[in-house]
Amino acid sequence: MRKLKSKRKNYQPDPIYQDTLVTRFVNHLMKDGKKTIAYRIFYNCISEIEKTKKNGLKIWKEALDNVMPHVEVRSRRIGGSNIQVPTQIPPYVKVTKAMKLLISCARERNEKKMYKKLAEEILSAYKKEGAAFKIRENIHKMAEANKAFSHLKF
């Protein structure tokens, strides 16, 4: 067990929107340290969303809110059986899980270009449909089903 909690990293705001949330998203999107390519994918994705005559950044943030899980289930061993215990997720972790969920579901889509995959997944999450939203709903259903064990501490 670690002695001290690790310090949370301070992120620089991104060059266009001056938003640290965008930088965090781009860091999760990045592969093999290629940050400029990740920024290009994100900005192309936002411009693709703006073709629907709406503010791309607002749609992206609302899609993140729609995909964000509020509870999760964690396994705990009690009396020889594993029990799924629903627990609250801290706000910082909620955002991280939402970002990773959105990106992983976008990577599984069938479009050719990554920015189009990401744009389609963001738009579907904005409309409360799509793979990422379904996964979030499944997480919440599991937590609801195991609500009886919520009194157990993890």
Swiss-Prot record:
GO biological process, one term: translation
Keyword Ribosomal protein part of the UniProt annotation: yes
Gene3D superfamilies in UniProt: Ribosomal protein S7 domain
GO terms for MF: rRNA binding; structural constituent of ribosome; tRNA binding
UniProt keyword annotation of rRNA-binding present: yes
Keywords: Ribonucleoprotein, Ribosomal protein, RNA-binding, rRNA-binding, tRNA-binding
Superkingdom assignment: Bacteria
A single GO cellular-component term on record: small ribosomal subunit
UniProt-listed SUPFAM superfamilies: Ribosomal protein S7 (SSF47973)
Matching HAMAP family: Ribosomal_uS7_B
NCBIfam families from the UniProt entry: rpsG_bact
Protein purpose: One of the primary rRNA binding proteins, it binds directly to 16S rRNA where it nucleates assembly of the head domain of the 30S subunit. Is located at the subunit interface close to the decoding center, probably blocks exit of the E-site tRNA.
Sequence similarity: Belongs to the universal ribosomal protein uS7 family.
Summary of subunit composition and partner proteins: Part of the 30S ribosomal subunit. Contacts proteins S9 and S11.
Protein name as catalogued: Small ribosomal subunit protein uS7
